[in-house]
């Protein structure tokens, strides 16, 4: 007969109990009621948060946007072709966030921060919420430093400051993206981190921008966030917020950042598509009622931080595409009212060969001369007025047959001023050279130069100042003002060029 030892049995049972460790997981799980057009209706997610990430059985991620009494409206961040009616959905307990870090510089990523340039994984040191609160009033400082675009017409008449939001608006094919890309290229010596967000663009267009930045050596300090035209509307909708989160990482580290949203019209269209599919009530132009908030909460994140927070800044250049120059449409008026000014690019000027095609009459910077160095204020003060008077006289002179000498002189000067503001793409001009060029035009030194020779004159003047009179640029860089010594050097350079051109 087997000898039973109760104490041994009880010790074995005790050991088994001690080892027993079944982790109990409480998951918030729902069931798919309906799926289609990138939208899922889910039943049973009672504890879900607005904007929470949900995971479907095929590992597709969605965002809970509509919380209704009997179901949840979820937008998918992927194709979701394997999701079936009746399949389960799990709440992750997380709000959409994106990895951030210095490793993102020089890379192309998608709306979720994953690399799409084939250069391998990105090591990230941190994560940031895609939607985060904008800095408050106490956290901010008024805009006081310029961000030089390298485009003479903008830096002189529509100056942009660090922490400002300046809208670039115009019809298709008027050079909006060129202005933004030139601004990125001009930051090479300025220690500014740039983020370019491409929304709903062709993959070929994004590839050409990457190549252009690489050729100019500007990709090293730039992050490109791309949500191409073939991607789901959800990814096009969150791309700008992802870009803002990456820029904020650098801003809160005390760096100056520049972010370009190209373009917010396509983001609004993607949001309209999502909202209509979620059956939210449509408003003007079929946009949902909160489309203003869509853009205001994004653009309010641009700021110049106070010294206590490190003094970093985020300058935003949103781009909006108009239809046939109609700036009074819904989205353009919304964004104009949110931003601190706009640069209006005109199709007529572009076709007339005036490039950049900036319509100076309705372009404005609400920060004004606070975002300019003293030297630029000294020379550019009269420029906008002169050009406005010239435009008026030019329209009038088409009907008048005989004009007095003063009017003819003003027209001649206006033509030369317009000529010096023309600038090819991807060729930014330093602020010292801009000051020299505007000084030459505004003080009548070009009045005797034939209009077709103005470009050559300006080119020779820049070469002369760079090679023979480097002290001119040094003086402006150090003092930020056009002193009497610098002015004498400039006058002597102008005289040299006039002599050499005969």
UniProtKB/Swiss-Prot annotation:
Chain residues that bind ATP: 170-177
Stored PROSITE patterns: ATPASE_ALPHA_BETA
Record GO cellular component, one term: proton-transporting ATP synthase complex
Transmembrane parts of this sequence: none
Keyword Thylakoid: yes
Protein topology in the membrane: Peripheral membrane protein
Cell compartments where the protein resides: Plastid, Chloroplast thylakoid membrane
Major localization class: plastid
One term of GO molecular function: ATP binding
Keyword Ion transport attached: yes
Catalytic activity: ATP + H2O + 4 H(+)(in) = ADP + phosphate + 5 H(+)(out)
Annotated site (Required for activity): 363
InterPro entries tied to this protein: ATP_synth_asu-like_sf (IPR023366), ATP_synth_asu_C (IPR000793), ATP_synth_asu_C_sf (IPR038376), ATP_synth_F1_a_nt-bd_dom (IPR033732), ATP_synth_F1_asu (IPR005294), ATPase_a/bsu_AS (IPR020003), ATPase_F1/V1/A1_a/bsu_N (IPR004100), ATPase_F1/V1/A1_a/bsu_N_sf (IPR036121)
EC number annotated for this UniProt entry: 7.1.2.2
Keywords: ATP synthesis, ATP-binding, CF(1), Chloroplast, Hydrogen ion transport, Ion transport, Membrane, Nucleotide-binding, Plastid, Thylakoid, Translocase, Transport
Class of this enzyme: translocase
Gene3D superfamilies, per database record: 2.40.30.20, ATP synthase alpha/beta chain, C-terminal domain, P-loop containing nucleotide triphosphate hydrolases
Pfam families according to UniProt: ATP-synt_ab, ATP-synt_ab_C, ATP-synt_ab_N
Quaternary structure (record): F-type ATPases have 2 components, CF(1) - the catalytic core - and CF(0) - the membrane proton channel. CF(1) has five subunits: alpha(3), beta(3), gamma(1), delta(1), epsilon(1). CF(0) has four main subunits: a, b, b' and c.
Function text: Produces ATP from ADP in the presence of a proton gradient across the membrane. The alpha chain is a regulatory subunit.
Family recorded in the similarity comment: Belongs to the ATPase alpha/beta chains family.
Name of protein: ATP synthase subunit alpha, chloroplastic
Species annotation: Rhodomonas salina
